[in-house]
């Protein structure tokens, strides 16, 4: 991150570590606009989630549309390329009549999870851009006090439209606003620590729904397997009742059982593959957010968390 250059004058008092210019902050100098650049605000259908949390209803609407498109494509592939055994096997796993009660919910949950994770990834990338803003003075001679805090706050508001919607800038704004109110640093460290815990809980809770989908999708697959087994065994039982010991009829009944097993295990395969892709995407995003958090912790400590570092700057 480049050293901060402050575009602000504070009366006749120069703030250590900041350079004064003749250009006051204004709406035209915004570097990031949450209301225009956040992916959910660009779509504009639903209220944007906090920080990196996606709007669940938006993800569900996208999932319904994607599920409809997916099954339409599968039906087309089956009708146009049924002679291809691979295409036929793939298509039937989804659109076989006995599988639909399982595959439709499983695919819907899959696209819901993937939509939420995609939106979350875009929001995380947008939040990370705040780290590149020249909002924080990093000169070694900078002294944090009530006067300099006001200048930094004005600088932050000149760079973004809504600092409270940025994970990093919201914490900084809260810290400096309290510093301006109480006129000291010692109590700010406690506020920062509480805010940091709230932010971490907010980020962690954004994975709760998709984590639930990771286990619920395979459960749907197992339900489909049980249904297939049940229907096959029931058909075989009826065959035994009417066969009268006829081996040919018994063999035919066993064939129905094996077909039921094949149908049942198709749903499990579909569900496990869906859950695998969801889990891989979750791990990918968690790694990205971990990198973001690491960079976040490496920003100036006097504005973030560590009370000893903060107090050492008080004069």
Predicted features and spans:
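Membrane-interfacial helix-loop-helix connectors in multipass membrane proteins
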Residues: 84-94, 233-258
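Large intracellular
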Residues: 2-199, 306-315
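Hydrophobic alpha-helical transmembrane segments of multi-pass membrane proteins
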Residues: 98-111, 213-216, 220-223, 261-265
